[in-house]
Amino acid sequence: DVKFPETENNSHRKIVSLDKSWRVKFTHTNADSITSLIPETKVSLPNNLDDYYGYRQLKHGNLHGSAVYQRSINVEKREEKRYFLELQGVETYATLIVNGYRYPKELVGRTVFTEDITQHLHNGDNELSIEVDHPEYIKDSPWVCGGCSSEWGFSEGSQPFGIYRPVSL
């Protein structure tokens, strides 16, 4: 397990960890013959869906594709407050869906991404989904897959796939 520093709770802002109670399911991958056999799985974050770390010494052994993470959250919504979802690391693109509202797809990578979800959050139970896309041969991100590089062994096996850092509200 990876441990991250505890958040300060003595400020005016309340930060709630959403790292527990996720369900994840592959939607498609470059290894569909293997990943299609994997049922929806319960996970905690951080979570790397690609367990290949270069040990097979392949030029391109990385897993690419899409998956969806889902969970319910219960919120005591107060009208005078704003609610932000913070993703600290998703490889490579993330699409947030809050109670059926689909936010635009964002390049997240190894940066922190924050979205104001106040307008689509309800008092009480809410459904949250994060669609994760990690395609092959990425050209619009500084964090490319080493296996997709034309250079042999360039960071091969080092690219995570999924939500690999904390998520908070």
Predicted features by range, described:
Residues 1-88, 143-166:
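Extended carbohydrate-recognition surfaces in non-catalytic/accessory domains of CAZymes
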Residues 3-5, 97-149:
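Beta-strand-rich ligand-recognition modules
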Residues 70-74, 82-86, 95-97, 116, ...:
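Residues within well-ordered beta-strands of beta-sheet-rich folds
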Residues 91-92:
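Short, solvent-exposed aromatic-acidic interface loops
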